[in-house]
Amino acid sequence: MPRFAHIFEAAADTLNAYYQAVAEVNIDSLMGLWIDEEFASCIWADGSHLHGLDNIRAGLAIQLEALPVSIEPIDIRVYDSLGTVVYAIAEAHRPADPKATPSMVFTTYVMVHERGEWKIAHIHASAMPNEAANQFAAKMRHGQGSLH
């Protein structure tokens, strides 16, 4: 495998670590995945905007402690360049509470290569409208792939 391919595998490792830390509600692990810059930003599916690491930490703690979830990537699109990887992902967010309703979310993760590691610089999540979620699920059931 070419050397550059290994670089982008490491970005996927960061994404997987993010999903794991979210499921564990491990705020310290989550924050270790972010770039150490105040320009870091996060937009939640509910529309909340968080700018800067302190605000992101506080927002993650509030949101994940109030409604712990596990995230399952359903469809992943990757766009990369030498120092940046962008993941555009359709995700199923499953609350830890079995009585709570799961949701479908479109999320974009922007990662940058910093000091030999891939770090999250920006996350933008948008709730998937019910009609789109139903179409998405129907295509998945019929084996057409999610974005055909």
Question: Can you name each region flagged by the protein language model?
Answer:
Residues 36, 79-82, 114:
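Structural motif
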Residues 3-6, 67-68, 83, 119-121, ...:
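C-terminal-biased regions
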Residues 3, 10, 41-43, 54-100:
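Surface-exposed, charged secondary-structure patches
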Residues 104-138:
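Short beta-strand edge/turn micro-motifs at domain boundaries
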Residues 18, 30-31, 40, 52, ...:
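Hydrophobic pocket/interface hotspot
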Residues 23, 91-96, 111-113:
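Beta-strand elements of well-folded, non-transmembrane domains
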Residues 1-33, 42, 139-148:
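Short, low-complexity N-terminal intrinsically disordered segments enriched in polar/charged residues
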